[in-house]
């Protein structure tokens, strides 16, 4: 079924899906009227059109450009952190406040239980993530998923609490960046993010980070240091957004598509570069096409990764995590 929000490259598919829906309505009416000849003709037309829809859907979504994946990552109907928490976990207890200044609604977190009966797995975890809104009112409440310093300090407080009780940490990353306002700078935005990098590298519990949508710059890495970095298929992760990169290099946002290509910010790019460890496949058309399937796929991956990490010694965990991030990037000492 077509979604309410249609991206430019999805319009041909959306039009076909609308036509298919109209024909199905006509088929039901024809069946009620006992018009056998018309019903048989409509069935044949619907079958032909369904084949066209499936072919076009595969053609579009299996050949997405980097910029088109950025657009999908920003789709307003994608599942957000709280959606994943309630679909994947039980008994979520939200914990609020950084105990210094305020409670940042752009980051949510708390204890929850993740269970998988088939794998005989049940574990209490600390889950933390960026939270966006779906309309103007909720986006203002969540600050469009752009965390303030108190958001990162809240996240760190919850991580240290998890460490105290020996519980694994799962972070869900989906942000256009840390909030760049003057008030955030005055309250130590850079220090808060830097402190999180230091502390997360040394947490003596398993840490799994998942980029579920946008992974922009320091706003993402502020809760993005872990033993395993997972990324859903149509997410993006980069030091800068394509629009901002285009604005800096070409003094205009109109080169954002070229910027996206140059940044190599997709899951496939980052897996090849060794930045992430695993790609979580999305339903054809994006996570918003089937949120429940997406959540189940991610949950299965999390259970697998947690099962492996929880068998490791604490000292081994920290040592491997530090070496993992120290090895990232390319260095030229002769330049």
UniProtKB/Swiss-Prot annotation:
Component of the acetyl coenzyme A carboxylase (ACC) complex. First, biotin carboxylase catalyzes the carboxylation of biotin on its carrier protein (BCCP) and then the CO(2) group is transferred by the carboxyltransferase to acetyl-CoA to form malonyl-CoA. GO terms for molecular function: acetyl-CoA carboxylase activity; ATP binding; carboxyl- or carbamoyltransferase activity. One of its GO terms (cellular component) is acetyl-CoA carboxylase complex. It is found in: Cytoplasm. This is Acetyl-coenzyme A carboxylase carboxyl transferase subunit alpha. It comes from Prosthecochloris aestuarii (strain DSM 271 / SK 413). Residues 48-308 form the CoA carboxyltransferase C-terminal domain. HAMAP family: AcetylCoA_CT_alpha. Pathway: Lipid metabolism; malonyl-CoA biosynthesis; malonyl-CoA from acetyl-CoA: step 1/1. Keywords: ATP-binding, Cytoplasm, Fatty acid biosynthesis, Fatty acid metabolism, Lipid biosynthesis, Lipid metabolism, Nucleotide-binding, Transferase. Belongs to the AccA family. The keyword Ligase does not apply. Gene3D superfamilies: 2-enoyl-CoA Hydratase, Chain A, domain 1. Acetyl-CoA carboxylase is a heterohexamer composed of biotin carboxyl carrier protein (AccB), biotin carboxylase (AccC) and two subunits each of ACCase subunit alpha (AccA) and ACCase subunit beta (AccD). It catalyses: N(6)-carboxybiotinyl-L-lysyl-[protein] + acetyl-CoA = N(6)-biotinyl-L-lysyl-[protein] + malonyl-CoA. InterPro entries: Acetyl_CoA_COase_a_su, ClpP/crotonase-like_dom_sf, COA_CT_C. Its EC number is 2.1.3.15. Its main location: cytoplasm. It is an enzyme of class 2 (transferase). Pfam families: ACCA (PF03255). One of its GO terms (biological process) is fatty acid biosynthetic process. It comes from the Bacteria.
